């Protein structure tokens, strides 16, 4: 469960009051019966994070400065959200403002900036401070913090201890974001949302709590626009498939009809019925095959466009490509074969007399 509250208030504009609230509220959350772990984070998975400029001090792209997702967290954040650590350690209560600045980065960040091996122990530079990478976490999906639109994805993300977050940056983040109080329970408990609100209210009765949500609710909200876009795209795709089928049927049928008279003459001169049917069908099916080949080549470019807008679209989907190609090929075969039955009714003598 996730509770959200605004900290965009003057009384939390200094580090001492901010950290005191986090520590006391997390302790209150942990006191709720059935709670396994509790933590606070600026954002949670599926949400847009703060965009922040970070320079890589060493690694594959040493010296490069880029904007990435930044999330401040308290200890147990990864445990509460069940985000596995792939390397190194998590952030702990020992990571204070007076200790070495540290961070956990996700696999997407490590792969892009630090290289695939020995990422733990590398260093980042931010606001004149050197930050040591102490852990690599698994990726979670989220919108990019510095783009509008596009699908949620595994964006490069840096997680830093809330105690080491610069106060000015914390205050700026609270203008745009409502921090999240996260708990993980041993099972489903009735009234857990009310207990979370009571725990926060016990620490600060004036804390403006905007709501309590399940992670499934946050995921649904994050994917709402994606669902609308996917439904619209599916409808348009079905319409395009229908129009393609009608077009292929009409084109192939027309090609066959145009050659009916010619084939009647060929039959009068000794061509067999089977040979005439093959001759008239071949051109239409060949034209369809050429069109399918061109469509398959263009599909790779179309997939890249769709992937830039929708989450979870596979780069290669041979099953769908084969199914659509087979359907259109079947339409072409039917369109080519049906008119050929007229050939069987052609009287070669009548055709010669007409000529």
PLM segments and residue spans:
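Membrane-interface junction motifs in transport/secretion proteins
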Residues: 1-19
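Hydrophobic alpha-helical transmembrane segments of multi-pass inner-membrane transport and secretion
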Residues: 225-261, 289-290, 294, 331-334
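Intracellular coupling helices
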Residues: 246-287, 345-353
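Conserved G/P- and acidic residue-centered "switch" motifs that form tight phosphate/ATP-binding loops
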Residues: 88, 106, 270, 295, ...
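Mid-to-C-terminal secondary-structure elements
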Residues: 20-225, 231
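Small-residue-rich transmembrane alpha-helices
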Residues: 282-345
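Alpha-helical membrane-protein architecture signal
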Residues: 22, 212-216, 225, 231, ...
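Short coil/turn motifs that cap or connect alpha-helices
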Residues: 84-86, 90, 259, 272, ...
């Amino acid at each position: 469960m996730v509770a959200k509250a605004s900290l965009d208030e003057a009384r939390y504009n200094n580090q001492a009051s901010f950290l005191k609230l986090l520590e006391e509220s997390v302790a209150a959350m942990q006191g709720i019966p059935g709670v396994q772990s509790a933590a606070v984070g600026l954002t949670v998975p599926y949400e847009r994070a703060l965009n922040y400029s970070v320079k890589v001090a060493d690694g594959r792209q040493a010296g490069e400065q880029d904007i990435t997702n930044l999330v401040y967290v308290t200890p147990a954040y990864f445990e509460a959200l069940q985000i596995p650590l792939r390397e190194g350690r998590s952030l702990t209560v020992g990571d204070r403002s007076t200790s070495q600045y540290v961070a956990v980065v996700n696999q997407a960040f490590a792969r892009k900036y630090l290289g695939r091996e020995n990422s733990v122990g590398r260093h980042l530079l931010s606001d004149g401070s050197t930050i040591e990478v102490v852990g690599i976490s698994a990726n979670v999906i989220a919108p990019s913090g510095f783009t509008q639109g596009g699908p949620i994805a595994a964006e490069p993300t840096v997680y830093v201890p809330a105690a080491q977050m610069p106060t000015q940056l914390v205050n700026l983040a609270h203008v745009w974001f409502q921090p999240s109080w996260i708990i993980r329970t041993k099972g489903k408990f009735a009234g857990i949302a009310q207990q979370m609100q009571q725990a926060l209210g016990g620490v600060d009765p004036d804390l403006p709590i905007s709501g309590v949500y399940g992670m499934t609710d946050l995921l649904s909200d994050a994917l709402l626009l994606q669902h609308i876009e996917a439904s619209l795209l599916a409808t348009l795709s079905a319409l395009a498939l229908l129009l393609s089928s009608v077009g292929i049927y009409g084109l192939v049928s027309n090609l066959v009809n145009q050659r009916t008279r010619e084939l009647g003459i060929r039959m009068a001169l000794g061509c067999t019925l089977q040979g005439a049917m093959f001759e008239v069908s071949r051109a239409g099916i060949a034209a369809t095959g050429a069109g399918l080949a061109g469509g398959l080549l263009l599909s790779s470019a179309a997939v890249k466009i769709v992937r830039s807008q929708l989450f979870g679209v596979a780069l290669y989907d041979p099953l769908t490509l084969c199914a659509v190609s087979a359907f259109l090929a079947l339409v072409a075969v039917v369109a080519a074969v049906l008119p050929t039955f007229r050939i069987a009714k052609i009287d070669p003598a009548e055709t010669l007399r007409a000529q």
